[in-house]
Amino acid sequence: MVDQEKETTHFGFRTVAKEQKEGMVAEVFHSVAAKYDLMNDLMSFGVHRIWKRFTIDCSGVRRGQRVLDLAGGTGDLTAKFSRLVGEQGEVVLADINESMLRMGREKLRDKGIVGNVSYVQANAEALPFPDNYFDCITISFGLRNVTEKEKALRSMFRVLKPGGRLLVLEFSKPLLEPLSKAYDAYSFHILPKIGELVAQDSESYRYLAESIRMHPDQETLKSMMMDAGFENVTYSNLTGGIVALHRGFKF
């Protein structure tokens, strides 16, 4: 039984073999990539932009620094970081999903954001970067889709410079029971219908809702970050705990 648990993981509410999850998640994001930005605005009523703005404000990123926007998708954070680091800095937009990475590259180039941004297809569990390389790493709404989160956190710790910080922006556990019930009703009954109407894909958005429920809560993720080596780990609850921003440092 213990051996079986070591070889399985969650895909939404389903239990699947670990080697299957990466491909299953890939199919979800191949499917949603083209409508990803539109669906983000619809699903969150545009509030995701405020959550991301808060993340940027907490990053402490300065001119000349090197930033990794991990699971960066369509590049919302990368666009902001590109301006902050300036010509002497560098932003790496990394994503495991080719379709999402392509959408991000096309969107940023259309905006004229070139020169200090590079694009890398990478698995968070085995980042292809040198030790002590980045001043700041962000992973926004991506960690819950990673098969082995502890391994990914250790990989992020390795490539972060001493003195650098990791910011994890992710859906979490609402603080109040009435909010939690309303959020569940929205996520499981309304969200898949929006996905069907706008993206002709209810199943992918049902998975996204389920993956949120299976993600570690605020205190559990804090402990996971500390176990990976991060220090001074704190978190801020946003929108009543629907989302949390975790921050940790490497010293």
Curated annotation (Swiss-Prot):
Pathway this chain belongs to: Quinol/quinone metabolism; menaquinone biosynthesis; menaquinol from 1,4-dihydroxy-2-naphthoate: step 2/2; Cofactor biosynthesis; ubiquinone biosynthesis
Keywords: Menaquinone biosynthesis, Methyltransferase, S-adenosyl-L-methionine, Transferase, Ubiquinone biosynthesis
Disulfide bridge positions per record: none
InterPro entries: SAM-dependent_MTases_sf, UbiE/COQ5_MeTrFase, UbiE/COQ5_MeTrFase_CS
CDD domains: AdoMet_MTases
GO molecular-function term, one example from the UniProt record: 2-methoxy-6-polyprenyl-1,4-benzoquinol methyltransferase activity
Record's function text: Methyltransferase required for the conversion of demethylmenaquinol (DMKH2) to menaquinol (MKH2) and the conversion of 2-polyprenyl-6-methoxy-1,4-benzoquinol (DDMQH2) to 2-polyprenyl-3-methyl-6-methoxy-1,4-benzoquinol (DMQH2).
Protein name stated in the entry: Ubiquinone/menaquinone biosynthesis C-methyltransferase UbiE
Organism: Yersinia enterocolitica serotype O:8 / biotype 1B (strain NCTC 13174 / 8081)
Name of the coding gene: ubiE
